């Protein structure tokens, strides 16, 4: 049976200017976890003159979810943001495509090192016909230059390319030490800051592996890691597409409610496990949630008079722990990708596990409607959107924040007659207004989302409480079980 080999690759991680740099503060730089934005010119501001409801369906969803100008401005600078790549990443990074092998004339751009063999002489002679004898080579940006048919560690045979990002690249390999099992091998650039960030992620993945020996908590587990001539390499199981990529390829048709319910239950289950082990993911978004198998069937939607893709298996895995933070570690001021960032982070009031709960609420809305709930890239506008959709920000949060420049006499400073103000007024409405139906299960979903989107993190529902919510009463026994046949042991 065909199994999709693509991993996630939303788009590159670049920032358009230092103004929009997000995740790590300068205090984290000395810990090796500061991410650096690429130097790009800011994109043109989107038009604010049209009502959201009057924009044609596909155009509106492109503007509200897939627009590169928005998804690049406030991306998480996690080095693993393209941990599970796909062909989309290669199309969006023309300037970063691999250069061909350098000639001697251009050898000064490359760092060449003689390949070392860890096998015995007899093993080398037996496998010499399979392995390339050429030297290890990096391009000028520190990416490992590799081709299909190359081997790493005399164990991993490269059979395909899955994507490339700021952090490095992901290739599909056959693991000859485990019966030619298929793996996704993440190869980090030979650059100090990315190498150190990879070590931090490996540490988190090792902790998860220790706590989840039975592989039942739905986190992507690391099967192996090694240092290949300065390139940190992490091997993962090969999974399907990420949930955003599938949504995009389905023309942003929302997921059916039963699919939303099953994915929501798995998300709450996985993140409760992390939270119980004093770990906050901090970068939850549809790109970091992968289908185990993204095979689909095509169905005709009579209501919309179009064909839709319906994924056959809604089992998911949570990925990208490059920004995960333990309770005892330093908590940087800014975390989470803009669209999924909670108010306590914007107001710089400190954050903890409830940060992830807010992100899940935003993700569920996106699954349900096909576009993001908060489509913005600026703090003040983001807060105004929150108030339009969820009600007023609690006064005690306003009094505590250092960001008093956003407020005057206890209210947000905002000009509703500006183009931005008119856009927010026309396109943001109370949360329940987005319900597609008034049936009980839709009402229950919106009740769960509203409790996840409480302004005050102390009042926000916990994931242990969320798993008991009536919305999940409609799950089948099979959907409530978490069986795993994975064997990620090294």
Swiss-Prot record:
Biased composition regions of type Basic residues, renumbered to the chain: 88-116
Biased composition (Basic and acidic residues): 26-56, 63-76
Chain segments annotated as transmembrane: none
Phosphoserine found at: 9, 49, 51, 67, 76, 78, 135
Example GO BP: protein phosphorylation
MF (Gene Ontology): ATP binding; identical protein binding; protein serine kinase activity; protein serine/threonine kinase activity; protein serine/threonine/tyrosine kinase activity; protein tyrosine kinase activity
Residues annotated for ATP binding in this entry: 162-170, 186
InterPro entries (alphabetical): CLK_kinases, Kinase-like_dom_sf, Prot_kinase_dom, Protein_kinase_ATP_BS, Ser/Thr_kinase_AS
Catalytic reaction(s) noted: L-seryl-[protein] + ATP = O-phospho-L-seryl-[protein] + ADP + H(+); L-threonyl-[protein] + ATP = O-phospho-L-threonyl-[protein] + ADP + H(+); L-tyrosyl-[protein] + ATP = O-phospho-L-tyrosyl-[protein] + ADP + H(+)
Region annotated Disordered, chain positions: 1-138
Active site: 283 (proton acceptor)
Main EC class the enzyme belongs to: transferase
Modified residues (Phosphotyrosine): 7
Entry-linked Gene3D superfamilies: Phosphorylase Kinase, domain 1, Transferase(Phosphotransferase) domain 1
Primary location: nucleus
Organ and tissue specificity: Present at high levels in testis and ovary. In testis, expression is restricted to elongated, maturing spermatozoa. Also present in spleen, brain, lung and liver (at protein level).
Organism superkingdom: Eukaryota
Biased composition (Low complexity): 117-130
Keyword vocabulary terms for this entry: ATP-binding, Cytoplasm, Cytoplasmic vesicle, Kinase, Nucleotide-binding, Nucleus, Phosphoprotein, Serine/threonine-protein kinase, Transferase, Tyrosine-protein kinase
Subcellular locations according to the entry: Nucleus; Cytoplasm; Cytoplasmic vesicle, Secretory vesicle, Acrosome
Domain Protein kinase: 156-472
Post-translational modification: Autophosphorylates on all three types of residues.
Protein name as annotated: Dual specificity protein kinase CLK3
Source species of the chain: Mus musculus (Mouse)
Designated gene of the protein: Clk3
